[in-house]
Regions:
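Beta-propeller domains
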Residues: 1-381
Length: 381
């Protein structure tokens, strides 16, 4: 069963207050793949017509995208712990689902965490020490690792939050953090993690830059092992689609594309990659500077690609110039930052009526944008 909602962690740009809001996931999807393909064809026609109208000197920018509109009312409001008594020096560092779309964990810069239950509208404050030891393991666990591992603090770079998923809210036992064995590459100075994913119910794959290798962590035996001198082809996390028996993620070589591979075909060899390209919405103007791109798994082969941009059109201080050498910018100037949410659906080959594509196809659905004025989207989970 697919997800019903996308959770947005939003910051009030004026007060610094954060809130949790939700939008229906089906807002990003057409009723059918046929309707999506017809809409994409019309969008491409509009794109081409706009470029032709401006003699190839101007990019459509947001003109071919839908506006998300006003954000829904907040379900929760919260604020990070002030840093040294200074309210302006505070921020959230982390947001994640806990088992399902209705339970969210949020942590601030000081390590304080809260759990939000969207259905019961309840909050669990969890300020327990993150270095708790013990052998009690609940039904589900959330694993958290520093993306850039520091050898001096490696003993605390990998932790797990144990909790129960049998309750709809947080009225059960208080979740607790436990430190785990650091990864083998933690002794390297520049051991940045490039990609990671869950392979089965008890195994996590992690690829690192230094050295270029992929490792597996057994969550039952709590042991690491080296898989080989290869890295997964993803930038950040990858998600498994059981209907297609493939892992999908943003490509490390092409950040505006998806790629897919089978990580279990032969763990000793690099996985074979299938590139899946997005289309119009990711043909961006040169003045759009991306600083956050994420892939959200909605289930049943559906994804939401989250792209947050800062527009630098006309900002000479950032070295932006119009490469067309004319008086027209490559898109209408957009002030500040904005987000683009795109619904994608991965489907297998049809295999009938001679329409077999010979592999997985990507169907692009809707792309919707939201300008950051009074509110900024910090996380989509």
């Amino acid at each position: 069963m697919g997800r019903r909602f996308l959770n947005l962690v939003v910051e009030n740009a004026r007060s610094g207050l954060y809130s949790l809001r939700r939008i229906p996931a089906n807002h990003l999807f057409y009723p059918s793949t046929r309707a999506a393909e017809e809409a994409t064809a019309k969008s491409q026609e509009s794109f081409n017509a706009y470029v032709k109208e401006h003699h190839g000197r101007k990019h459509p920018g947001l003109h071919t995208l839908e506006m998300l509109g006003k954000l829904p009312s907040p379900m929760f409001n919260f604020e990070p712990t002030p840093w040294d008594g200074q309210r302006r020096h505070r921020n959230l560092e982390f947001a994640s689902l806990l088992g399902n779309e209705n339970r969210i964990l949020i942590a601030d810069h000081s390590g304080h965490t809260i759990g939000c239950a969207a259905i019961s509208l309840s909050i669990k404050n969890n300020n327990s020490n993150k270095n708790i030891s013990g052998d009690m393991w609940d039904e589900d666990s959330l694993y958290v690792m520093s993306q850039s591992v520091d050898p001096e603090t490696k003993d605390y770079c990998f932790e797990v939050l144990n909790y129960t998923s049998s309750c709809k809210d947080f009225r059960g036992r208080t979740p607790c953090w436990s430190s785990l064995q650091p990864p083998p590459f933690a002794n390297y100075m520049h051991a940045d993690i490039t990609s990671y994913t869950v392979v089965d119910s008890s195994t996590i794959y992690v690829s690192s830059m230094e050295p270029d290798a992929t490792y597996a962590f057994d969550t039952v035996g709590r042991q690491w092992r080296r898989l080989g001198c290869w890295t997964m082809p993803f930038d950040g996390k990858a998600e498994y689609v059981p209907e297609l028996k493939l892992w999908f993620g943003l490509s490390v070589d092409h950040p505006y594309s998806l790629c897919a591979c089978d990580l279990l075909s032969d763990a000793a060899k690099p996985p074979t990659v299938q590139q899946q390209h997005t289309w119009v919405d990711l043909d961006i103007p040169e003045s759009w500077l991306p600083y956050n791109i994420d892939l959200i798994n909605l289930g049943c082969g559906r994804f939401c690609v989250v792209k947050i941009f800062r527009s630098i059109a006309g900002d000479c201080t950032l070295g932006f110039s119009d490469y067309d050498d004319d008086d027209t910018m490559d898109s209408d100037p957009i002030q500040g930052k904005f987000a683009v949410l795109t619904g994608l659906q991965m489907v297998g080959p049809c295999g009938k009526d001679g329409d077999d594509q010979g592999g997985v196809r990507m169907i692009k659905h809707k792309s919707m944008y939201y300008n950051f004025w009074d509110y900024e989207i910090e996380w989509v989970i």
